């Protein structure tokens, strides 16, 4: 859904014709909102029980200002989505070059969970399975992505925080072999334990 550019020249003609006096950014967001609403309505018209959702960037500032996606509106208002799943692919110790820890896992999860949300909309999180072994590019790399249980720790954190679930990007990364094969196996085992898979009731 991201436009090929944020340059004003991209949609000058359409904006001049249909902008209606709105600020350009507001007009673009309104168009995206209309698109999401119509897709949601079309899905429900064909199959009411189908679940429709969107997985935006974990950085909601970028969603709003660069992709013209008003995710806060979709979360708080019925008729846009059934769920939102932000792509939170950073670790617990992630820091930016300027030292900011805003996007460290727990911090950004709490930021999302604090957003107003309608009861009809679920909030789950996308976790970066592809980061295992390779790291997340943090300015202060901590080695957490080589622990063998980072995804499991995240799954537990989300459960404690009251999130509605999680998904892995990409699930296939856990079975890709290569230099991190043993680490991936450890992550799979830890995830299974965190999810109670293969355990029997006492």
Set out the residue ranges of the language-model regions:
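Substrate-binding cleft of secreted/luminal carbohydrate-active enzymes
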Residues: 76-201
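Polysaccharide-binding and catalytic clefts of secreted carbohydrate-active enzymes
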Residues: 1-73, 77, 89-90
């Amino acid at each position: 859904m991201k436009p090929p550019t944020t340059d004003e020249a991209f949609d000058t003609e359409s904006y001049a014709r249909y902008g209606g006096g709105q600020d350009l950014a507001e007009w673009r967001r309104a168009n995206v909102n209309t698109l999401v609403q119509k897709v949601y309505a079309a899905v429900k018209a064909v199959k009411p029980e189908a679940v429709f959702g969107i997985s935006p960037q974990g950085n909601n500032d970028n969603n709003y200002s660069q992709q013209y996606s008003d995710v806060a509106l979709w979360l708080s208002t019925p008729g846009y989505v059934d769920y939102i799943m932000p792509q939170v692919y950073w670790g617990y110790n992630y820091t930016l070059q300027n030292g900011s820890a805003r996007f460290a896992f727990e911090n950004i999860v709490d930021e999302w969970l604090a957003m107003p949300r309608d009861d009809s909309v679920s909030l789950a999180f996308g976790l970066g399975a592809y980061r295992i072994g390779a790291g997340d590019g943090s300015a202060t790399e901590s080695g957490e992505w080589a622990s063998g249980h980072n995804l499991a720790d995240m799954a537990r954190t989300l459960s404690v925080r009251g999130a509605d679930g999680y998904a892995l990007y990409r699930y296939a990364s856990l079975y890709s072999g290569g230099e991190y094969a043993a680490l991936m196996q450890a992550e799979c085992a830890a995830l299974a334990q965190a999810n109670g898979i293969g355990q029997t009731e006492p």
